[in-house]
Regions:
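Short intrinsically disordered terminal tails
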Residues: 1, 23, 117-118
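Short, extreme N-terminal segment that most often corresponds to the first beta-strand
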Residues: 2-7, 27-28
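Short alpha-helix capping/helix-loop boundary micro-motifs
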Residues: 8-19
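His-enriched metal-coordination microenvironments in redox/metal-binding proteins
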Residues: 32-37, 117-118
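Basic/aromatic-rich interaction segments and small domains that mediate binding to polyanionic partners
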Residues: 45-65
Length: 118
């Protein structure tokens, strides 16, 4: 991953981890975009442990827009996930991929962020 080519944010560049992490069901994952971040959860793991299916969180914003604080579980402690919003990823060629595209992921981290300047 190259700063300025794959990401415009130094924080996202530092967060993204292209190394292999053995995914586990229930593990949190953060996808690092150009400046934003999206929170996902592992819902299924492939038999060879080199791929998994992620489901997108549907976090609820807490406070005002610039605070960037989110609630990821409902009152009962159940994760708030978007129905039908999934992504299947595979680790190949030393990168996490979704189809032919490389995705910049941070495992064991749940972080939602929307850049307010856009």
């Amino acid at each position: 991953m190259k700063l300025g080519k794959d990401t415009g944010s130094l924080v996202n560049f530092m967060l993204a981890n292209p190394n292999f992490v053995k995914p586990e069901v229930g593990m949190d994952v953060t996808e690092c975009h150009w400046t934003d971040r999206s929170a996902w959860r592992v819902v299924a793991v492939d038999d060879d442990l080199k791929g998994c299916t992620l489901q997108r969180y549907a976090p609820k914003a807490i406070g005002n827009y610039y605070e960037q604080r989110y609630q990821y579980e409902d009152e009962a402690g159940k994760p708030m996930l978007k129905e039908g919003h999934t992504m299947h990823i595979r680790y190949k060629y030393k990168r996490w991929k979704c189809g032919r595209s490389t995705v910049n992921l941070r495992f064991k981290c749940r972080c939602e962020y929307e850049d307010p300047s856009f």
